[in-house]
Amino acid sequence: MSIDLNWEAATSGPDGEQLAERIRSFIHDKFQQVPLPRFIRSVNVHSFEFGSIAPELEIKDICDPFVDFYEESDSSEDEDGEGHDAESDTSSDRAADSTADKRDMRYGHDDRGNNGHIPNHHDHLRTSQWVAGGTDGHSTQSPLRSPIGLGDHLNAHFRSTTPNILPGVTSNLGYHLMMGNLSGTQTPLAAVAGGTPFGPGWPDAVMNQGSRMTDHTTGRTRREDHNKNETGSPSRPSTAHTNPTQLSHGRSAASSSNNTSNDPTVIYNDHTSSTTATTYGLHEGGDRPRDKHGHRIDQEEPPPSPTPHMRERRPEDFQVICRVKYAGDVKLSLTAEILLDYPMPSFVGLPLKLNITGITFDGVAVVAYIRRRAHLCFLSPEDADALLGDEDDIQHPSYSTANTTTAASGSSTDNNNNNNESNDHPNHPPQPRRRFGSLLQQIRVDSEIGRKENGKQALKNVGKVERFVLDQVRRIFEDEFVFPSYWTFLV
């Protein structure tokens, strides 16, 4: 069922201008987060226009919303309140947990208010999982893409006797941060800033912890001797027999562009997990952890991973799946500053103006209406094929018959040419036809670089910059709009 869309009413007026400005600002912010190649200094987005050509919409199905749309985020608690302006947000907000819960998990506070208990390896594993962004062993991309700031740890409470922060872990972290042979049993994590417990400017609270640290010396020394015998190095525990922890899960596609391997946070967690396994004898033939008196500590089972809170389904909730075809004149204006390396590196920068004058789009959109929220996303080509492929074959039987006839005649020709090998090499079934290709099939762009002299551009070799900008536009669209990512609008 096809529907008519009043494109002019939806994209013009104050509301249309405000939406266009928000899209421009969103794309501009995304370009500021992209690592630029050496020959590009900066990329700025100046304007965005919807154009005058409306997309073609064909409703394929009306069904119940996807389960992912019912996951409740912090911002959803005010959905029944009053006086809230319409706003949109991506599904990455759903991955953010409350700061108080993370702090309690890190410093060992439980629901009963006990913040001084015997540290075991399960507690520390939960601590390292928190740093990775998840509580079930899988990493969750944090909205903040920078490593953990050292300022959060520069306080007197973060020391080797703090619950859940174990000796050896700080030593290993110190090794990773180029600390040399500073031992975690004598130096708190704050020593990475360049100080020591006996250096100038160190808080007096840490200087007075000598009596407390003496009680734990016996048990700690036993574990350090065990590490020294295995590795021969007092400052770097062995990770030779430790399997790396799985810190990524799910697609990446969407995250093909996410550089998790270069994230310092991921490297930090890999080290801490290895240190935990070495310290507590989790290797093959290792011993169980002991307290300061030499008694074995009973290992508690970790609590089950918390499941996301789901909204309650209502009879009025519905979802529309539609085919979207667009070959319009949407406009996007960008400026990229190119660096010239002659006669010296980064000698001068030339502005390259890129104007995207239109795109060709063919995909499947999903719009779910739940309470006062509308969720919008697009399906990947694989999901669209699985959902609508059979239906397209029914609607276009002649195309499918032609493909079958061609495949049959091709198989007959192969059999005539290879009669002797027909038994050894059976015919392979024909590959299924892809109904949907790339979502953004074509992007039309005009470029202008430098000053024009006599109607001609000073430089014309701008192909690399154009390809980079267009690739980033495709990546931003696929990362932010393709399911399981989606946008939410308050209606």
From Swiss-Prot:
It is a peripheral membrane protein. Residues 72-82 have a biased composition (Acidic residues). Pfam families: MMM1 (PF10296). One of its GO terms (molecular function) is lipid binding. Residues 230-249, 270-279 have a biased composition (Polar residues). It comes from the Eukaryota. The keyword Membrane applies. Residues 72-123, 201-313, 389-434 are annotated as: Disordered. One of its GO terms (biological process) is phospholipid transport. Keywords: Endoplasmic reticulum, Lipid transport, Lipid-binding, Membrane, Mitochondrion, Mitochondrion outer membrane, Transport. Its main location: mitochondrion. It is found in: Mitochondrion outer membrane; Endoplasmic reticulum membrane. Residues 252-262, 400-421 have a biased composition (Low complexity). Residues 1-491 form the SMP-LTD domain. Signal peptide: none annotated. One of its GO terms (cellular component) is endoplasmic reticulum membrane. Residues 83-123, 213-229 have a biased composition (Basic and acidic residues). The SMP-LTD domain is a barrel-like domain that can bind various types of glycerophospholipids in its interior and mediate their transfer between two adjacent bilayers. Component of the ERMES/MDM complex, which serves as a molecular tether to connect the endoplasmic reticulum (ER) and mitochondria. Components of this complex are involved in the control of mitochondrial shape and protein biogenesis, and function in nonvesicular lipid trafficking between the ER and mitochondria. Mdm12 is required for the interaction of the ER-resident membrane protein mmm1 and the outer mitochondrial membrane-resident beta-barrel protein mdm10. Component of the ER-mitochondria encounter structure (ERMES) or MDM complex, composed of mmm1, mdm10, mdm12 and mdm34. A mmm1 homodimer associates with one molecule of mdm12 on each side in a pairwise head-to-tail manner, and the SMP-LTD domains of mmm1 and mdm12 generate a continuous hydrophobic tunnel for phospholipid trafficking. This is Mitochondrial distribution and morphology protein 12.
